[in-house]
Amino acid sequence: MFSFFRRKKKQETPAPEEAQIQETVAKVESEVAQIVENIKEDAESLAESVKGQVESAVETVSGAVEQVKETVAEMLSEAEEAAEKAAEQVEAAKEAVAETVGEAVGQVQEAVATTEEHKLGWAARLKQGLTKSRDKMAKSLAGVFGGGQIDEDLYEELETVLITSDMDMEATEYLMKDVRDRVSLKGLKDGNELRGALKEALYDLIKPLEKPLVLPETKEPFVIMLAGINGAGKTTSIGKLAKYFQAQGKSVLLAAGDTFRAAAREQLQAWGERNNVTVISQTTGDSAAVCFDAVQAAKARGIDIVLADTAGRLPTQLHLMEEIKKVKRVLQKAMPDAPHEIIVVLDANIGQNAVNQVKAFDDALGLTGLIVTKLDGTAKGGILAALASDRPVPVRYIGVGEGIDDLRPFDARAFVDALLD
């Protein structure tokens, strides 16, 4: 019996190989468990990391969204402010434009009113300036226009009045024929109706002289050469012309070409200072050289107008007439088409002798215009009629006073009205 139990106990004891296997299995199970544990830990760590990254990404995206929202909100706010400012600027611009237009309209209206006042002022000065001529003619014509029938005796009286007013024979004959034709055409009978006929006849005669000087639009200087006898008023006329052109927005330069008289140079320099205009002069040298230098200076400085004075001379002084021809030639060398205007200044006091002067200077230089001065100091207003009939060179300007504004473009209608009204 004891032996039976001993055998059984011997059978339950594992064999060495089996024990080794079990040990290996246990070891493997332990390692597997460890691996599983490690994997589990790694998985949990990875999950935590991914979760953190996801949460960070979500947070970043949320922040970006908020930033975009804020940026968009700021942009919208700025856009609204810009729109409001733009609207305010548009309104301000509208108001400014309206104000500017209003001011411009006011300035235009003021300029028109000033122009009308100026016209009236000039008409009054012209009428006052022609007082001596008008009074003489009015006194002489009183008997003609005083009534009575129009007959040959009346025509003879009218003819005498015209001749004594320095309307030479040619002009007088033209006017008498024109008046007779108007009387016949209109069936005029009474002597007081002759005034209207004479006014229209005189206007038609001198109207061709009314050709105002028109300055071309050019970048080159416009050169005006002035000539005449001593005492005609050349230098004074140049000073007044400078002021006149300045009022038109033109820049002016003066050439003191009267080198024979120191007083003429000083007088022109005084006008230059008065008008704030540059004067080109030389203490020595001839007139042509001064005028040449003046044109060169004007070209270099971009001046609009050059007014070139020359020495006074009588048409009978042949050597001086040759000298003034030289001035013209030298000006042509300074500028190929200069002088653009050649003007003779006439003293109205010399009466019909003015026609001879115009003919002489015209033959020598080829005149383009006249300035008739001192009409306020003479009773010889008929000089323009004589010029119109004998040598109709355009009368650019007339002077009826000592004032700086008393030199103005010739207006035939205004002249006739001032002379005969």
From Swiss-Prot:
CC annotations in GO: cytoplasm; plasma membrane
Subcellular location: Cell membrane; Cytoplasm
One GO-annotated biological process of the protein: SRP-dependent cotranslational protein targeting to membrane
Span list, region Disordered: 1-22
Catalytic activity of the protein: GTP + H2O = GDP + phosphate + H(+)
Function: Involved in targeting and insertion of nascent membrane proteins into the cytoplasmic membrane. Acts as a receptor for the complex formed by the signal recognition particle (SRP) and the ribosome-nascent chain (RNC). Interaction with SRP-RNC leads to the transfer of the RNC complex to the Sec translocase for insertion into the membrane, the hydrolysis of GTP by both Ffh and FtsY, and the dissociation of the SRP-FtsY complex into the individual components.
Quaternary structure note: Part of the signal recognition particle protein translocation system, which is composed of SRP and FtsY. SRP is a ribonucleoprotein composed of Ffh and a 4.5S RNA molecule.
Stated family: Belongs to the GTP-binding SRP family. FtsY subfamily.
Name this polypeptide is given: Signal recognition particle receptor FtsY
Naturally occurring in which organism (per UniProt): Neisseria meningitidis serogroup C
